[in-house]
UniProtKB/Swiss-Prot annotation:
GO terms for cellular component: cytosol; ribonucleoprotein complex. PANTHER family: ELONGATION FACTOR-LIKE GTPASE 1, TRANSLATION ELONGATION FACTOR-RELATED. Catalyzes the GTP-dependent ribosomal translocation step during translation elongation. During this step, the ribosome changes from the pre-translocational (PRE) to the post-translocational (POST) state as the newly formed A-site-bound peptidyl-tRNA and P-site-bound deacylated tRNA move to the P and E sites, respectively. Catalyzes the coordinated movement of the two tRNA molecules, the mRNA and conformational changes in the ribosome. GTP binds at residues 28-35, 94-98, 148-151. One of its GO terms (molecular function) is GTP binding. InterPro entries: EFG_II, EFG_III/V, EFG_V-like, EFTu-like_2, G_TR_CS, P-loop_NTPase, Ribosomal_Su5_D2-typ_SF, Ribsml_uS5_D2-typ_fold_subgr. The modification Diphthamide is found at residue 597. This is Elongation factor 2. It is found in: Cytoplasm. Keywords: Cytoplasm, Elongation factor, GTP-binding, Nucleotide-binding, Protein biosynthesis.
Length: 732
């Protein structure tokens, strides 16, 4: 039996013992060494050869990832580790640290129960560290900490043991501050990471060594030994004395929960159904004999097998030939192949039971986030993404005969990555692709060329703006075209606290399942409870409230009013850009008794025009997306980089020096950031390391707004002059 077969046999045996399984991920800020850590863990567990690890970046198996040196797709690998004489199955999901791929991180978090948070010892906790940790804690994923690149503190910064320990203490304090802030109430203290119990390890993923207090106690290796061996350059002895995979995987087995433990507290939070039902109990108990339920976390296209859906099995057993329901898409499907991952390689199995990560084919048209079950059940909570698409490009096929293929390719990309928004316009042949940033879109366009062999024309990137209001409007009347229906509404700015709660997922988007609970939450955040009681719908960071009393036939048209509200929010009055942070209130209505006279053709224009007219009376403004830009540069380039940021309407937020390196944190409008990579390379002779993350929206300065509105309107084929109130409000 070869090594590979032996490994598969072991994995098969352990898959049926949930107490021996750990589903875990590794998450970090970009370039903090996440993929190098993953690869050396795999090498240690015998999945790839040690010579290749760290150079090969085995999890970066997309050729583009290898070229860019950043992880783009969350890949999954199963491996075996022995701890205190027992074998454990560890399913490792590698996630990207680059903000443009934040959606992948969110989806991976749904599948795992624990995460190693990697922090660079030199840079410390960075903005993206906070983002990934917040995502983990929101999904009830327990963290442990690995402090990486300790060799740089010894060799480059020449710190002594005490200074190094002070550095560790600061990082641990920073991480614990975030855990206290973002962890679920019941785990705020329980999940804090501590050096003493081994929930913190430190080392160098690149040089393949690590230490933790339990390991030091067990083996007698001291930190002093490490400093001496590093300074002497004796890396071989270092690796033998303190092997990375042993220390880190021991920490994983000891501190991260198995599926039996984790599902007890994760299922009530992640699933909206009745916990006391048979299927609810089967998931809470991770029961392989229960009804099969899995959640798809990723879709990839395999040249031979077609669409492969990776996901977490919460209850029951996934088997070949099983007939299943795709709950969100309201469709049936039949599972064709069932398997697990070992790196990019998929190994087929007859069945995979609850508590494992599975790869299946046959779920055509499933999207990431889909709930799959053998019977119709409540779906899992919608996955919550931290960023929103802010950059758009228009794409056209150069060759008309490629049009059907392009549409198919765009649909496929959207299915694999729900953070990518695709708008297909079959009439004009011009399709819009919106993503989290320039890099996100570049990667997708590259795939159109290489995987789909498509030749496309791409417009320069366009920024997605938002429209909003600055004050409360008077009551505005909206009349239906036949004059038989009238709606009286106001709009006003949505308070910041409520907008943030919607963005954070504390107030769910959509029609509330439990309006009383949502009204209570709105009241806690400062809205008058009498007004909040009228909550009807939450849509893209806007809310619609019904504050009428006893209006006849209102319930019959409420669905149409909500649709009309969506239309008004999708395209605001200034430049047909999406609307954000607006509260729309319905105060009164007169509705025709005969439903022939109150159909969509009457209700939509009435409510849409009323909302837009009210917005024009409420001080309409334009918001633009901002990015936080984190740049590491040698000290001498400080001046040229500051100039580069200032020229782009950017602001410096923070600066700190670490040895020879300056870390600059700034914010700048996305519109000014195109081509920044090249300019920065030029300004620093290629010596800058940088990353970005979404920093929300800010109001466009008045002196720029008129021009921007003109440009957007012109691009959309509208009259370029910004509309005035009388252009939008119907003359009475």
């Amino acid at each position: 039996m070869g090594r590979r077969e032996e490994m598969i046999a072991k994995i098969k045996e352990l898959m049926t013992q949930p107490e021996r399984i750990r589903n875990m991920g590794i998450a970090a800020h970009i370039d903090h060494g996440k993929t190098t850590l993953s690869d050396n863990l795999l090498a240690g567990a015998g999945m790839i050869s040690e010579e290749l690890a760290g150079k090969q970046l085995v999890l970066d198996f997309d050729e583009q990832e290898q070229a860019r040196g950043i992880t783009i797709n969350a890949a999954n690998v199963s491996m075996v580790h022995t701890y205190e004489g027992k074998e454990y199955l560890i399913n490792l999901i590698d996630t990207p640290g680059h903000v443009d791929f934040g959606g992948d991180v969110t989806r991976a978090m749904r599948a795992i129960d624990g995460a190693i948070i990697v922090v660079d010892a030199v840079e410390g906790v960075m903005p993206q560290t906070e983002t990934v940790l917040r995502q983990a804690l929101r999904e009830y994923v327990k963290p442990v900490l690995f402090i990486n690149k300790v060799d740089r503190l010894i060799k480059e910064l020449k710190l002594g043991p005490n200074e190094i320990l002070n550095r560790f203490a600061k990082i641990i304090t920073d991480v614990n501050r975030l855990i206290k802030r973002y962890a679920p109430e019941e785990f705020k203290n329980q999940w804090l990471v501590k050096v003493e119990d081994g929930s913190v390890a430190f080392g160098s993923a690149y040089y393949n060594w690590a230490l933790s207090v339990p390991y030091m106690k067990r083996t007698g290796v001291t930190f002093k030994d490490i400093v001496e061996l590093t300074n002497a350059g004796d890396l071989k002895t270092l690796r033998q004395k303190a092997p990375l995979h042993v220390v880190v995987l021991d920490m994983v087995v000891r501190h991260l929960p198995n599926p039996l433990e984790a599902q007890k507290y994760r299922i009530p939070h992640l699933w909206r159904g009745d916990i006391n039902s048979d299927v609810g109990q089967a998931m809470i108990n991770c029961d392989p004999k229960g009804k099969m339920v899995m959640v798809v976390t990723k879709i990839i296209l395999d040249k031979h097998a077609g669409e492969v859906a990776t996901g977490r099995v919460w209850s029951g057993t996934v088997k070949t030939g099983q007939e299943v329901y795709l709950i969100n898409s309201k469709r049936k499907a039949r599972i064709q192949q069932v398997g697990i991952y070992m790196g990019p390689e998929r190994v087929n199995m007859e069945a995979v039971q609850a508590g494992n990560i599975v790869a299946v084919t046959g779920l055509r048209d499933a999207m990431a986030g889909e709930t799959v079950s053998v019977e119709q059940i409540e779906p899992f909570e919608a996955l919550h993404y931290t960023s929103e698409p802010v950059v758009t490009v228009a794409i056209e096929a150069k060759n008309v005969k490629d049009l059907p293929k392009l549409i198919e390719a765009l649909r496929q990309l959207a299915k694999e990555d729900p953070t990518l928004h695709v708008k297909i316009d079959e009439e004009t042949g011009q399709h819009l692709l919106s993503g989290m940033g320039e890099l996100h879109l570049e990667v997708k366009l590259y795939r159109l060329k290489t995987e789909w062999k498509l030749d496309v024309d791409v417009s320069p990137p366009i920024v997605v703006y938002r429209e909003s209001v600055t004050k409360q409007s008077p009551i505005v009347e909206g009349k239906s075209p036949n004059k038989h229906n009238r709606f009286y509404i106001t709009v006003e700015p949505l308070p910041d606290a409520i907008y943030e709660a919607i963005r954070e997922g504390e107030i769910p988007e959509g029609r509330p399942k439990d309006p009383k609970a949502v009204a209570k939450k709105l009241a806690e955040l400062g809205l008058d409870y009498e007004i909040a009681k009228g909550i009807v719908d939450v849509y893209n960071g806007n809310i619609f409230l019904d504050n009428t009393k006893g209006i006849q036939y209102l319930n019959e048209v409420m669905d149409l009013l909500v649709d009309g509200f969506h239309q008004a929010m999708d395209e605001g009055p200034l430049a047909k850009e999406p609307v954000m942070k607006v509260m729309v209130r319905l105060h009164d209505a007169k509705i025709h008794e005969d439903n022939v006279h109150r159909g969509p053709a009457q209700i939509y224009p009435a409510i849409r025009t009323a909302i837009h007219c009210a917005m024009m009376k409420a001080g309409p403004v334009l918001y633009e997306p901002y990015q936080k830009v984190i740049i590491n540069i040698p000290y001498e380039y400080m001046g040229s980089v500051s100039r580069e940021i200032n020229q782009r309407r950017g602001q410096l937020i923070d600066m700190r020096q670490e040895g020879e390196v300056m870390i600059i944190i700034s914010e700048a409008p996305v519109a000014e950031m195109f081509g920044f990579a090249g300019a920065l390379r030029g300004a620093t002779s290629g010596k800058a390391l940088w990353s970005t993350e979404h920093a929300g929206f800010k109001r466009v300065p008045n002196e720029l707004a008129v021009n921007i509105i003109r440009q957007i309107r012109q691009r959309k084929g509208l009259d370029p002059n910004p509309p005035k109130e009388q252009d939008v409000c119907p003359q009475q």
